Amino acid sequence: MHNLRDFQPAKKPGTRSRFLQIVAEPDRTKRRKSRAKSKSQPKLTRVAFRVSRLMEFCTLRELQNQTGHSYEEWPLVVLKELMDNALDACEEAEVAPVISIAVGRSSIAIQDNAAGIDTGTIESILDYTIRVSSREAYVSPTRGAQGNALKTILAMGYVLDRERDDGNNNAEAVGVTIIETRGTKHAIEFAVDHIDNQPKITHTTTPSPITVGTKITVKWPAKAAVWGEGLLEWAEQGLKKLVESYAWFNPHLTLRGVWHGKQFIKVVATDPNWEKWRPRNPTSSHWYNKTQLQRYMAAHVARDRDRKRQRTVREFIAEFRGLSGTVVQRKVLDEVGCSHQSLAEFFGVEKVNRAGIAKLLASMRRHSKPVDPKHLGVIGADHLKQRFLAAGGNAETFKYDQRKGVTNEGIPYIIESAFGLHQSALTNDGVNSVPRKLITGANWSVGIVNPFRAFGRTGEGLEATLSKVRADSRAVICAVHLASAYVQYADRGKSSIILTNDAEQPDD
């Protein structure tokens, strides 16, 4: 409230009052008390804390984002990634893969017969500030190029050990992974430094009897559970199905699987000499667009800079299929005008030479032939029929189909499918028949879930197609595989493939 004295008539010098001016003055006593009180109250001075991005691997939510799968599916993620790595390693070593899988009550172990992993590569996997992959930036028919799969696997044990059913976190959580290769056992413990708030990794080595190939054992926390059931037991059927599915799409694979000491699968390769596009085969310039070639070139420039070397444009060109000869290299260099130029200089220092990269790509394509789809690798009717019969299929109902082509973007592909009825569907009117078996995958890897959920412009997927022919619930066996120089996924978990209209399902 204001006193009447606060309202004073306004006057001009030498004149009488003409209007009333209201001057509101706050109570001086209250104002002084307010200032005194403000000074006596404690104040918070905010500071900027540093939070490591590496913690993205150390929480349940973030690791689910990294893998693209919920924690209930992590046993399947571990198996898929380690199987893909083992198969790729065997093909790089140019040996027919012999892989064994053993699932215990608290561990998943996979062993291959490839060339093994050198210590430097293992140490780079433990560096969470970088992403290391021999398939990163390449465009080629490969099982995967995530680049951080092993990093996520190392962290899974810790995250599952950290999260408790009672809602509390285990401060002493640790994830344990063992890599045995080239006579050395690498024991890796993944934990967290709670002061620096970043991963703390302990790496110790001891002798190992494993001298051929690599054996990776992922320890699983005993308390990791789903609805009161151990996580590995929860995933048992999915794990066994995933293991079996790899045998469908890899004719050169000899495979053995053991569950709690009991063998559940043993498959001998139908064709140990089976040929497909291998990781060591040169990629084709026809598979890259301008953005992808720029990324691939940048990766080379960055690696050369780290290794303090200079690669020429000619050396870069020589890596591509059909461009290894000096005559064709000279034609490309002359057309682009980059003879005797280093790749780093051609790429650009202050600004990316996009026009030059586009011109180089056009010239490389002009002087090399596109890859025929058949060179990607055909699984074939004989192998798929053998797997079909082993799964209990009826030989007379077996059908095989193969479609191949090249997309509008120049990407070759082959789609193979095998279909037929299980024996149980032909007896007793299908009563007590087994459930439908659906095996799907791309580039000789297997999908954790069906990745063919949308075909071309129709938007309908494999499930809808099976429903149309009334095969959605009957005891049918259906396998679909896509081989392509470039597979585009709709999600990080690689659970849904984006198919262009070039690769629609057939009308018949």
List each model region and its residues:
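Helix-hairpin-helix
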Residues: 314-333
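Conserved ATP-binding N-box helix of the HATPase_c
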Residues: 71-103, 149-156
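GHKL-type ATPase core
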Residues: 3-14, 18-22, 28-32, 39-47, ...
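Short adenine-binding "F-helix/F-box" segment of the Bergerat
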Residues: 122-126
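Glycine-rich G1-box
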Residues: 115-116
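Conserved short strand/loop->alpha-helix "switch" segment adjacent to the catalytic nucleotide/phosphoryl-transfer site
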Residues: 54-79, 138
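GHKL/Bergerat-fold ATPase module
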Residues: 13, 38, 221, 231, ...
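Acidic ATP/Mg2+-coordinating residue in the GHKL
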Residues: 112
